[in-house]
Amino acid sequence: MAIHTVIAEQSWYNDYNFMEVIQMNKNESAENYLETILILSKSLPVVRSVDIANELGYKKSSVSVAMKNLREKGHIIVDKSGFITLTQTGREIAEMIYERHELLSSWLIRLGVSKDVALEDACKMEHVISKESFDAIKKAIL
């Protein structure tokens, strides 16, 4: 059975445009990589693909493909030594995602959600929550 047939039979497919779902997953992946680079840059003198692979538990080859895509989009710079730095736009995206993650996870923990579940849920929420909703939550809890 073709993948498109299987997907079309899924109930969620009728509610979402399949290509939008694919694009959303690509954006989420890119945002996770940018956030990871930001976090690693706070504790390491330089960030390399191998550092990202170790942090995320991914194969170095997968990280290399992602770094190529982020570089092509202008979110990172990779120098001749393989050191990765965020561009201004890459840093802005990473800081936005990081702020969302930190605020949402701490909020969920204060609501009584276990730390593990709060961290996992915040990681999902940080990519899909609207600016309006995030700002409202931020205003309410700060």
Residue ranges and their predicted role:
Residues 3-16, 44, 120-142:
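C-terminal regulatory/oligomerization modules of transcriptional regulators
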Residues 25-58:
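N-terminal helix-turn-helix DNA-binding core of bacterial DNA-binding proteins
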Residues 33, 52, 63-73:
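Basic amphipathic alpha-helical segments that dock to polyanions
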Residues 55, 93, 110:
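Residues within the alpha-helical elements of helix-turn-helix
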Residues 57-58, 81, 113:
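The short coil/loop that forms the "turn" connecting the two helices of the helix-turn-helix
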Residues 61, 116:
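Key DNA-contact positions within bacterial/archaeal DNA-binding proteins
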Residues 73-79:
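A short, conserved structural fragment
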Residues 82-100:
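Basic, amphipathic "hinge/linker" alpha-helix immediately C-terminal to the N-terminal HTH DNA-binding motif
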